[in-house]
């Protein structure tokens, strides 16, 4: 998987950098978690301050285009980004916790 930065804009008003990127890959389509980790390492940004906005994969091609945002602090990210974007666009514990909270416990499933 190779990531190429296509555009980078500083948005001072929202305390973030807006990044456009392109990914070329072979084999299976990379997951959001893989893209998030590699993009964070590439930009030297903390993972809790980076959110992936969108990923667009064209049918039949091994290329993805997308956009991401890097905030100056995690507080700004939580203040500006909607919750569903934070859960979808950030890799890590937040995704696992949301799944664990939605899953019914074993006792409740047996009682039904």
From Swiss-Prot:
GO cellular component: ribonucleoprotein complex; ribosome
GO molecular function, one term: structural constituent of ribosome
Keyword field: Ribonucleoprotein, Ribosomal protein
Domain of life: Archaea
Statement: the UniProt record of this protein carries the keyword Nucleotidyltransferase: no
Keyword Ribosomal protein in annotation: yes
Region (Disordered) location: 88-112
Gene Ontology BP, a term: translation
Similarity comment: Belongs to the eukaryotic ribosomal protein eS24 family.
This protein's name: Small ribosomal subunit protein eS24
Lineage: Archaea, Methanobacteriati, Methanobacteriota, Stenosarchaea group, Methanomicrobia
